[in-house]
């Protein structure tokens, strides 16, 4: 007799098969712009925690997208399995390839725009160099992960 706990095999890989990144920058008449992109390919993530064990923090906290659209007799085409609570909550956390997500991504890690004032202007103020800039971190991510999870997240 095969026991369910013995009938398992390795699916997916949490370590990316490859990592890539590139930068781009340009400068024109004192204005500058730069950006850095980074990503990984062929990575899987086994989802755990709140997405699998809904309301596992003492049944408190906000209702998230993955708490909704659960299977019910009235919603047989739901995205997620039936939501259970208490002793039956193991139904949600059953080991299954359902909880493995494609975690490859491409992310704009940093974008920056700036302006460097001409040195002849700065000499009048006894300043050697002055540059103003604005920068943003992680403003854009392309991923197939569901539920709004960060594909760089490495915890459970």
Show which residues each predicted segment covers:
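Outer-membrane beta-barrel domain signature
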Residues: 7, 20, 38-45, 49-57, ...
């Amino acid at each position: 007799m095969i026991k369910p706990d013995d009938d398992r095999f390795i699916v997916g890989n949490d370590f990316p098969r490859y990592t890539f990144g590139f930068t781009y920058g340009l400068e024109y008449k004192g204005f500058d712009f730069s950006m850095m992109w980074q990503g990984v390919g062929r990575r899987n993530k086994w989802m755990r925690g709140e997405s699998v064990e809904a309301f596992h923090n003492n049944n408190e906290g906000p209702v998230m997208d993955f708490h909704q659209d659960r299977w019910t007799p009235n919603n047989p085409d739901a995205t997620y399995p039936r939501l259970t609570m208490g002793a039956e909550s193991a139904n949600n956390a059953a080991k299954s390839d359902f909880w493995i997500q494609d975690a490859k991504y491409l992310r704009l890690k940093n974008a920056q725009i700036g302006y460097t004032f001409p040195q002849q202007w700065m000499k009048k103020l006894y300043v050697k160099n002055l540059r103003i800039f604005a920068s943003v971190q992680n403003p854009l991510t392309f991923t197939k992960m569901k539920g709004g999870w960060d594909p760089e997240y490495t915890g459970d």
